[in-house]
Amino acid sequence: MGFRLPGIRKASFSANQASSKAVDVEKGYLAVYVGEKMRRFVIPVSYLNKPSFQDLLSQAEEEFGYHHPNGGLTIPCSEDVFQHITSFLN
């Protein structure tokens, strides 16, 4: 079960990666955690400059401050909303 969205890469874990805390992310990309299940998405850093994505970052700051439970950036919205917003950023 999978889907492909241009510009977004759903993180895949191998056995070795799952056991380590930090999983490599390609240069120019950023890992974020989204939804109740904290699904990991790898997005282009260029999204950080987009107003609609900055709204998500503001929500994350309001909810989590600068402490994110997974150690990475957590976006407080559903996966569907996240995918909808990011689909317009490509």
From Swiss-Prot:
The entry's keywords: Auxin signaling pathway
Highest rank taxon of the organism: Eukaryota
Pfam name, any one: Auxin_inducible
Swiss-Prot/TrEMBL GO biological process terms: auxin-activated signaling pathway
Factors inducing expression: By auxin.
PANTHER family per UniProt: SAUR-LIKE AUXIN-RESPONSIVE PROTEIN FAMILY-RELATED (PTHR31929)
Family: Belongs to the ARG7 family.
This protein's name: Auxin-induced protein 6B
